[in-house]
């Protein structure tokens, strides 16, 4: 009779357990890496009776105060928000939209997309798409006459339609402003679409407290993932957040709107880059991603355009707030977009 050779591992509990422990350790390391920014469910702003708007940028003013811009307002300025976080759970406990601070600056709609707070001067800077400028405002919402000295290559003629300045952030430790266009400049490459599958080639621009350009770094997005062409489509970088160590968090956002709205989706990815490394393009460190949808089973579609740091939470992590743009509650008889806020945790920063 031929003797069957049975693997020893089936009868060696110690050896088998050791293999299992090694595998578990490996996957634990992977999980820890992927969860540097643990997921948190998004919350509707309407639960606190905050009216829908076109919220496109957010910055922290300290404690529970934030400044938020809306890109369809006739006045140029920002809304003051009070957002109270649960320091243990990292969720929003209470939110309130307070006064609007702003003024007429000449344009019917300046299309404010990004906002940053400078605590040293107690002023706010607002980046707008309609004029491709970043203007400084006092804390009462009046122009100071100062602005970031953007290079001529970022002029209105250099951008694709509705793909101009989108992001703005400032870090008081590095004394640096950062801004970037949502999409490639015309001179830097063709428009990224679902058909050509090319990445956006972007220029991350750094400015000092003197508002002068002090650095330019090349950043490439992932390629579009949409499979179909559609006129209602947005792809590129929608927000930046500058960290104390000189690195940047970059929010890549792809928004696909189906022809009859059902089956629309938004995919967001957060990467970290280190401009000081001087790579071309900058090497990206993946941090976190999520997708929201409008379909038969999920109706949480959210177009995230704002991102900023918040306070330190009880576990020592730092709150990272994301804010979505509902296009003023855009929709039809069966569904309307909602404004959402999402809080993530940054650990080890």
Enumerate the predicted regions with their spans.
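Bacterial Sec-dependent N-terminal signal peptides
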Residues: 1-38
């Amino acid at each position: 009779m031929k003797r069957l050779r049975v693997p020893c591992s089936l009868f060696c509990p110690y050896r088998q357990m050791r293999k299992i422990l090694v595998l578990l350790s490996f996957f634990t390391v992977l999980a820890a890496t992927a969860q540097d920014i643990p997921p948190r469910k998004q919350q509707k702003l309407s639960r606190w009776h905050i009216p829908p708007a076109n919220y496109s940028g957010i910055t922290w003013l300290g404690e529970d105060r934030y400044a938020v811009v809306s890109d369809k307002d006739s006045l140029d300025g920002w809304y003051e928000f009070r957002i109270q976080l649960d320091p243990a759970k990292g969720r929003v406990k209470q939110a309130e939209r307070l006064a609007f601070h702003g003024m007429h600056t000449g344009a019917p709609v300046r299309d404010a997309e990004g906002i940053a707070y400078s605590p040293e001067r107690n002023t706010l800077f607002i980046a707008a798409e309609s004029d491709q400028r970043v203007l400084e405002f006092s804390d009462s919402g009046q122009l100071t006459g100062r602005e970031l000295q953007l290079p001529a290559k970022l002029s209105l003629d250099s951008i694709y339609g509705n793909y101009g300045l989108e992001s703005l952030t400032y870090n008081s430790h590095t004394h640096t402003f950062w801004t970037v266009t949502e999409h490639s400049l015309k001179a830097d490459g063709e428009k990224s679409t679902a058909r050509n599958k090319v990445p956006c080639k972007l220029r991350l621009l750094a400015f000092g407290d003197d508002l002068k350009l002090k650095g330019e770094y090349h950043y490439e997005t992932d390629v579009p993932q949409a499979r179909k062409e559609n006129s209602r489509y947005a792809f590129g970088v929608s927000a930046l957040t500058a960290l104390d160590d000189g690195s940047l968090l970059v929010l890549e956002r792809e928004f696909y709107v189906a022809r009859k709205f059902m089956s629309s989706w938004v995919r967001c990815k957060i990467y970290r880059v280190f401009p000081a490394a001087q790579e071309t393009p900058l090497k990206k460190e993946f941090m976190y991603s999520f997708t929201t949808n409008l379909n038969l089973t999920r109706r949480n579609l959210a177009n995230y355009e704002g991102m900023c740091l918040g306070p330190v939470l009880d576990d020592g992590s730092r709150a990272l707030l994301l804010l979505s743009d509902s296009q003023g509650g855009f929709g039809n008889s069966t569904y309307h977009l909602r404004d959402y806020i999402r809080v993530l945790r940054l650990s080890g920063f």
